[in-house]
Amino acid sequence: MTRPDIREPGDIDAAWLTAVLAEGGVDAEVRSFTARAVGTGQIGDSVRFTLDYARRGEGAPDSLVGKFPAAGAESRATGVALGNYLREVRFYQHLAPKARVHTPRIWFTDVDEASHNFVLMMEDLAPAEQGDQLRGVTLDQARLVTVEAGRLHASHWGDDGLDDLPWVSGSKAAPSSPVGDDAVAMLWMGFKDRYAERLKPEWTEVGDWVSTRYSWLGQRHDGPRCLTHNDFRPDNMMFATAAGGYPVTVLDWQSFAYGAGPTDLAYFLAGALPGDVRRAHEDALLALYLDTLRANGVTGYGMADLRRHYGQGAYLLFLTAFFAAMVVTRTARGDDMFIQMLGSAADHMIEHGALRD
């Protein structure tokens, strides 16, 4: 059977879905299907395809979920400019099998390196449900994610082989970022103007500090580097429900990097837990993370270094919040989410004394 080509959601037909199943090793024939948008992605759009079979072979799924470039022109242009689409496909093709973190099974994925058009057909993780940045997570869910973070980071801890891969953000082989210090400062000024009535004075002070230190903040980490997610938040995870599903699955690998592992942890805990809950359980969660690193082979990294690197890490959540707000298609939910992310990150940075040159 001919290998599937790269298609937009509206161009998909039963024959194409049959070819996708064949790529995954299933001999079946799709007769018809229904398609429904799912998820809350800012850069990519996801669609659930519920399948009806003329011939259902062994292992044929009831449904698949496809991910595609965002339909919104502004969001799509951002995904292309930042290399998000190419990066996610390459992650699943080359790094996911060794990453130790739970990711969805991929039935088929491909990307056009010239246009960055892509398709990612994955298992439907229902009845698991997508996390919600605005709702946050429970403490039990935070513990699950902390363990997943430790496993992910241990998988490529100090692995300088990642430096040779141009599609790994932060690697030595990666092309120069299209975003520079001046652009970040301008985006912050635009964000500050747009959301002035929703910003606390101390958040604005943090933003003025972060926005004038963009390059320096990206280079400040002085510890081992590892494979990081770089957008490690509930919206990019699926959690089990009473009806079933994997305990937690990590999605949306568009921003992964060779970077500082504790930054992922700060990014998640600062944004996903209420401040009082995070403060009450932060020490235990850091200990759980360090124990997971050690259980997965990491040596020579102690709690003092972890606390320092974790305390510095929430800057990326703050930066992502105002940067993304200004370069993706605007929505009401997006407005609320970016303010929540930014405020939580600012509070974390102030608490941990991160505003130091």
Task: For each feature predicted by the language model, list its residue ranges.
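Active-site activation/catalytic loop segments of kinase-like enzymes and analogous catalytic loops
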Residues: 90, 255-297, 314-334
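ATP-dependent phospho-/nucleotidyl transfer catalytic cores
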Residues: 129-229, 238-244, 333, 337-357
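All-alpha amphipathic helical-bundle segments outside canonical DNA-binding/catalytic cores
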Residues: 298-314, 345
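Juxta-kinase regulatory segment immediately upstream of eukaryotic protein kinase catalytic domains
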Residues: 1-33
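Short amphipathic beta-strand and strand-loop transition segments with alternating hydrophobic
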Residues: 31-38, 107-109, 215-216
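Glycine- and acidic
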Residues: 74-77, 130-135, 250-251, 267-275
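Active-site acidic catalytic loop and adjacent metal/ATP-binding pocket
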Residues: 40-58, 65, 211-261
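Conserved ATP-binding subdomain of kinase catalytic cores across diverse folds
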Residues: 39-180, 261-262, 303
